[in-house]
C-alpha cells in the first residue's frame, strides 16, 4: 500500500474520493482526531479498516456523512432523530439509529444500528 500526504485542495479531495470509490482507505482529520475511512457500503473496504487498525470485528465502525440527505441512505431516521439533525447540523453530531439493509453487517459488527 502506497502512502501519500496530500493538501486539502479540490483536486486532492477528488483524488481521495476516487480512492474510496475503488475500495481503498484514506486518513483524514475530524474535529478531534485523525480517522481512517473507507466506503461504508463496501464490505471489503471495511475489512481493510479493521485490519489497518487492529480493530476487533465486534467493535462497529462509525459512518461519517456529508450532509443531512446522506443520513437517509444508511439509517432509518425517526421524528426524534430528525429534530436533532435539523437543529444541530451542519456541525459535529453523533447519533445511533437503525441501519438500512444497504449497510454491510461487517460495518455494524452485526448490530442492527449504525
Feature roles, as predicted:
Residues 1-114:
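Active-site-adjacent structural elements in enzyme catalytic cores
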Amino acid at each position: 500500500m502506497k502512502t501519500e500526504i496530500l493538501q486539502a485542495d479540490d483536486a486532492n479531495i477528488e483524488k481521495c474520493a476516487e480512492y474510496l470509490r475503488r475500495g481503498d482507505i484514506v486518513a483524514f482529520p475530524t474535529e478531534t482526531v485523525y480517522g481512517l475511512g473507507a466506503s461504508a457500503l463496501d464490505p471489503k473496504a471495511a475489512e481493510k479498516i479493521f485490519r489497518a487498525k487492529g480493530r476487533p470485528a465486534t467493535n462497529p465502525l462509525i459512518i461519517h456523512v456529508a450532509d443531512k440527505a446522506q443520513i437517509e441512505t444508511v439509517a432509518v431516521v425517526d421524528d426524534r432523530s430528525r429534530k436533532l439533525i435539523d437543529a444541530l447540523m451542519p456541525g459535529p453530531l453523533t447519533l445511533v439509529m437503525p441501519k438500512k439493509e444497504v449497510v454491510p453487517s461487517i460495518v455494524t459488527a452485526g448490530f442492527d444500528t449504525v
